[in-house]
């Protein structure tokens, strides 16, 4: 497993956002949970990132960047793709803005 890969977790795509050292050594990793978009679904909000075929996914997919999950590596199934470089920067910025830790 590598940082920024997209895997399936609990039936949905998720992005691995833990640093590589944690991914290599720990049993639980930090992920962003994502949701596939369908016709009629609302457009992504300012705290969400949009992924698509360029990232290896079959359909447009939205990832909430203001809520981090801890997932057991053993529960991550089927590597689906890798987030593009420009989208990594967008996701990183949205994580920082979305968490706004203690107003900092």
Residue ranges of model-derived segments:
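Conserved functional hotspots at enzyme active or ligand-binding sites that engage polyanionic ligands
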Residues: 1-104
């Amino acid at each position: 497993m590598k940082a920024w890969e997209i895997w399936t977790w609990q039936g949905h795509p998720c992005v691995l956002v833990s640093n590589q050292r944690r991914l290599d050594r720990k049993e639980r990793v930090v992920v962003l949970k994502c949701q596939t978009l369908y016709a009629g679904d609302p457009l992504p909000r300012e705290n969400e990132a949009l992924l698509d075929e360029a990232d290896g996914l079959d359909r447009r997919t939205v990832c909430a960047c203001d809520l981090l999950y801890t997932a057991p590596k053993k529960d991550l199934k089927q590597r689906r793709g890798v987030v593009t470089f420009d989208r990594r920067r967008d996701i990183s910025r949205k994580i920082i803005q979305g968490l706004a830790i203690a107003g900092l």
